[in-house]
Amino acid sequence: NNHVIEGMTEIKVVLSDRREFTAKVLLTDPQTDLAVLRIAAGEPLPYLEFANSDAAEVGDIVLAIGNPFGVGQTVTNGIISALARTAVSISDYQFFIQTDAAINPGNSGGALIDTDGKLLGVNTAIYSRSGGSNGIGFAIPSRLVQQ
């Protein structure tokens, strides 16, 4: 996410096998809170295919992947609670996927995937008074990520 890398002079990407790479910023968009990074891994890396976020429905099961509080790669599950959520005030973009899958600080930029293992969205924010997950998390739909 843009809010994660904004103002950074050096960005490191750590893969699940603990390999670290310096990342190059290809694109940032504060309006949608998206950022695109590139690493030179020297070999093809696994990747997720895009899901059709326009076909998602309230009640669909989803998995949120991230690094909450820096503890390491974590997967949580939940459902899509709402679509096209507009009163989020996270960025200028107004059509977030809302989920009750636990999303905490450190999950930003992580994948929200569907039960087919496809990228449905990019985790970006939570509503929380405590700073932890209250079951109200938001992801940027894959439709926008693909643009």
PLM features per residue range, with description:
Residues 1-147:
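Serine-dependent protease modules
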